[in-house]
Amino acid sequence: MQDIKINDKSPHCSKHVLPAVPSSEVYLEDCVKALKRYADNYFDLAIVDPPYGLGNRLSDGGGKLKNTPMATLYREKDWDILPTAEYWKELFRVSKNQVVFGANYFLEFLPNTRGFVCWDKKQDMPTLSACELVWTSLDKPAKIMKKSSMDLDRFHPTQKPIYVYEWMFKYCKTQENDLILDTHLGSGSSRIAAYKGGFNFVGFEIDQEYYEKQEKRFNDFKSQLLLF
């Protein structure tokens, strides 16, 4: 984060330097409607993990995940459907660059790119995917990211560890004070990673339960920072 000097004109003000705190704004709101408020190229980077009908795959009688622990932990949600063409149009309009997790579900909406990332999840469970395709708008060689998908205190079906987002920010060469967008905030891992990196952040979450849980997670994270 950038350092800023506090006002030292007052004799009662100590002359030390404090780190600038990145902004972090999150809204309980439908992201498609919200994005219409923003100008073209408003965000430096959009890093998104849109829904792809996970609830249907967990609950369908023929689904491979039906009898797994994941199926009992996460229930089907009304919003858990594939994004519309309008969503993708707005996403590309308001952001300069984009990162899309689960890209194989959305290829009809994504332009050709060489900047794919294959996330090796180091996953041993045969009923879960061993890897995930991540689409980026960057003109860079494809990479393999070897990071475990396991996360403590998991409360969202597609929750990703904070260090996965930190890796992606480095791959994208994100700069301090860049403005990050996450349209489907979920567990809030992207928000915490952005805060740690000194990036400004705007996120949207339509589900009140997840909104409240990620808010608590973020505030707990900030409280831990104050202890050191």
Name every feature range the model reports, one short phrase each:
Residues 1-181, 188-228:
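Class I S-adenosyl-L-methionine-dependent methyltransferase catalytic core
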